[in-house]
UniProtKB/Swiss-Prot annotation:
GO BP: cellular response to fibroblast growth factor stimulus; chondrocyte differentiation; endochondral bone morphogenesis; fluid transport; gene expression; glycosaminoglycan biosynthetic process; heart contraction; heparan sulfate proteoglycan biosynthetic process
UniProt-annotated binding residues for Mn(2+): 540
Disulfide bridge positions per record: 85-90, 96-151, 286-300, 318-339, 626-676
Record keywords: Disulfide bond, Endoplasmic reticulum, Glycoprotein, Glycosyltransferase, Golgi apparatus, Manganese, Membrane, Metal-binding, Secreted, Signal-anchor, Transferase, Transmembrane, Transmembrane helix
Cofactor(s) listed in the protein's UniProt record: Mn(2+)
Modification(s) after translation: N-glycosylated at Asn-637.
Organism: Mus musculus
Protein's UniProt name: Exostosin-2
């Protein structure tokens, strides 16, 4: 261009107009393509959501802003993984500290570009999977952008797949991390460990004390209680919207879908197929597919082509065999299909086996028993198979279906180790939502820290017996451990007394007016209940002394998962009528304590209100009876334990109450109580009540000992 202009200074340039337009067009197009390539490179090098922005959110930074770190050849290299590491030896729990939410804080290191002395990058661009993993962590409640608050550190160095890694240089990059400290409290994620020809079952990168969330651990490389065994993520099952299939018998009893398996294993499987014919299907790689058909989504048997992973839904059991690596992505595909995995891989540590009960969802068969696998599976009852099919699908939905699910499950396991008193229960890990107790966690464990609120809350259900109510309030207020008194006013046609008329007591007194007159109102989880212990007491129970109530509370503190009460009752089997009978006579046994005066954990208010099986709650409210029996059934069914009757008192008759006031005096009432027991037993599908022949009394009760020296001198008479 310059030469042309110089040689034609006396006239216009000799470039035709159309040619100039075309050149401008191509230059512009080239510029756009170049900018697009630069933008694509920036996106690939930078993972989503790992840098904290000024507003506390997450931002994506330009590749130009990523600092370059040069690693000299003699940079320090961490020691190889310490196989003796356990949480109490290699993890610094003091970095985590105590916090009210019992949540660890996880810090993600900023992205850096590591290069060697020659300027060659140590690793390639961060993979899509690792990008998703970092995003999941940064979007979670665990994430913190303050390195000083962090308990756990996650590098932005992608080691998910060992294949492209430069082992030495990657280890040197890890050692450059600002808080590395021999890998203490650092977490690495790796799904494809090892390299040919040996294919080690754990990441070969030297990592010292760092925790490893690895896919494909063996019993030789897995540090139990320290490392976390995770699934090998399957993009195929994650991208395939495979509808859930109802449990039950399927076309094939046993199916093998893996392609690259050892020839000896394939011979064993083909021998089973030859023996059992159409009930066994052994698939292999397709060799006759049309051009353009994705081979990864097809499997073949002889010349028959099957869609994969859809074909897995046609089988009851699916084999999961070791390949070059011990961990296989096919496990995720099998679980998604609701096919029960038959794991034939000796020494394999199943994913999340620290918390997941794999006996409920899989069958593990030793490799030497592979020829007997068909007969082994035939011995499993059909009902159990269907439960395993449901459980397999549930495991995939909860823990396998996405990188996010894998990341959060890993962090939860580590969190449970650090805060064991707030750990997720076995049921919460393993029970599908249809059978677990929903969002409120069961607090009935051995606590490692004291409850936030001591004492108990007394809940008095009343309708219009004001004089008796005031006497109950006065007596209960004398109990030293009383924290609050809550009156549930169940009368919609009459206002409660004016505030000035209520007894003056030392603890807060709150009146709650209900919208409807229901007995179940006494078991509602009111926000005003701040203590763990609840005393349910009727407005006519005026005979209990403060010593009796205080002793009952202290017994409950020793057994917080029990119903601890005073009026004892019994259920009996009537052989003549062939049904259950309610018994209120004095006997040597009890199986219930009435909630007219009983202590229990406030957790059961939640279960009673929101999780009571069947129509029991509506039955109680309709018949205006048996709410106490329903609570006894509920507690016994949840805990599997009997009630505890305290103190010898058996008479709970209100001296001023007439026969009209006292429902228990009516013979019809007793018949209805028997009907309730039979109704509830039918709904629960069992009789959960446990019969016991003992009660709890103070140690010095009836001993010839000075009353002044007894802790509970006024226990009272029968």
């Amino acid at each position: 261009m310059c030469a042309s202009v110089k040689s034609n200074i006396r006239g216009p340039a000799l470039i035709p107009r159309m040619k100039t337009k075309h050149r401008i067009y191509y230059v512009t197009l080239f510029s756009i393509v170049l900018l697009g390539l630069i933008a694509t490179g920036m996106f690939q090098f930078w993972p989503h959501s790992i840098e904290s922005s000024s507003d506390g959110g997450v931002e994506k930074r330009s590749i130009r802003e990523v600092p370059v770190v040069r690693l000299p050849t003699d940079s320090p290299i961490p020691e190889r993984g310490d196989l003796s590491c356990r949480m109490h030896t290699c993890f610094d729990v003091y970095r985590c500290g105590f916090n009210p939410k019992n949540k660890i804080k996880v810090y993600i290191y900023p992205l850096k570009k590591y290069v060697d002395d020659a300027g060659v990058p140590v690793s390639s661009a961060i993979s899509r999977e690792y990008n998703e993993l970092l995003t999941a962590i940064s979007d979670s409640d665990y994430y913190t952008d303050d390195i000083n608050r962090a308990c756990l550190f996650v590098p932005s160095i992608d080691v998910l797949n060992q294949n492209p890694l430069r082992i030495k240089e990657t280890a040197q990059a890890l050692a450059q991390l600002s808080r590395w400290d021999r890998g203490t409290n650092h977490l690495l994620f790796n799904m494809l460990p090892g390299a040919p020809p040996d294919y080690n079952t754990a990441l070969d990168v030297p990592r010292d004390r760092a925790l490893l969330a690895g896919g494909g651990f063996s019993t030789w490389t897995y540090r139990q209680g320290y490392d976390v065994s995770i699934p090998v993520f399957s993009p195929l099952s994650a991208e395939m919207a495979l509808p859930e299939k109802a449990p039950g018998p399927r076309r094939y009893f046993l199916l093998s879908s893996q392609m690259a398996i050892h020839p000896e294993y394939r011979e064993e499987l083909e021998a089973l197929q030859a023996k059992h014919q159409e009930s066994v299907l052994v698939l292999d790689k397709c060799t006759n597919l049309s051009e353009g058909v994705l081979s990864v989504r097809k499997r073949c048997h002889q010349h028959q082509v099957f869609d994969y992973p859809q074909v897995l839904q046609e089988a009851t059991f699916c084999t999961v065999l070791r390949g070059a690596r011990l961990g296989q992505a096919v496990l995720s595909d099998v679980l998604q299909a609701g096919c029960v995995p038959v794991v034939i891989a000796d020494s394999y540590i199943l994913p999340f086996s620290e918390v997941l009960d794999w006996k409920r969802a899989s069958v593990v068969v030793p490799e030497e028993k592979m020829s007997d696998v068909y007969s082994i599976l035939q011995n499993i009852p059909q009902r159990q198979i269907e439960e395993m099919q449901r459980q397999a699908r549930w495991f995939w939905e909860a823990y396998f279906q996405s990188i996010k699910a894998i990341a959060l499950a890993t962090l939860q396991i580590i969190n449970d180790r650090i805060y064991p008193y707030a750990a997720i229960s076995y049921e919460e890990w393993n029970d599908p939502p249809a059978v677990k107790w929903a969002s409120v966690s069961n607090p009935l464990f051995l606590p490692l820290i004291p409850p936030q609120s001591q004492g108990f809350t007394a809940i008095v259900l009343t309708y219009d017996r004001v004089e008796s109510l005031f006497r109950v309030i006065t007596e209960v207020s004398k109990v030293p451990s009383l924290s609050k008194l809550l009156v549930v006013w169940n009368n919609q046609n009459k206002n409660p007394p004016e505030e000035s008329l209520w007894p003056k007591i030392r603890v807060p007194l709150k009146v709650v007016r209900t919208a409807e007159n229901k007995l179940s109102n006494r078991f509602f989880p009111y926000d005003e209940i701040e203590t763990e212990a609840v005393l349910a007491i009727d407005d006519d129970i005026i005979m209990l002394t403060s010593d009796e109530l205080q002793f009952g509370y202290e017994v409950w503190r020793e057994f917080p998962d029990r119903l601890v009460g005073y009026p004892g009752r019994l259920h009996l089997w009537d052989h003549e009528m062939n049904k259950w009978k309610y018994e209120s006579e004095w006997t040597n046994e009890v199986s219930m304590v009435l909630t007219g005066a009983a202590f229990y954990h406030k957790y059961f208010n939640y279960l009673y209100t929101y999780k009571m099986p069947g129509d029991i709650k509506n039955w109680v409210d309709t018949h205006m009876n048996c709410e106490d029996i329903a609570m006894n059934f509920l507690v016994a069914n949840v805990t599997g334990k009997a009630v505890i009757k305290v103190t010898p008192r058996k008479k709970f008759k209100c001296p001023e109450c007439t026969a009209i006031d006292g429902l228990s005096l009516d013979q019809t009432h007793m018949v209805e109580r028997s009907e309730c027991i039979n109704k509830f037993a039918s709904v629960f599908g069992t009789m959960p009540l446990k019969v016991v022949e003992h009660r709890a009394d103070p140690v010095l009760y009836k001993d010839d000992f000075p009353e002044k020296l007894k802790s509970f001198p006024n226990i009272g008479s029968l």
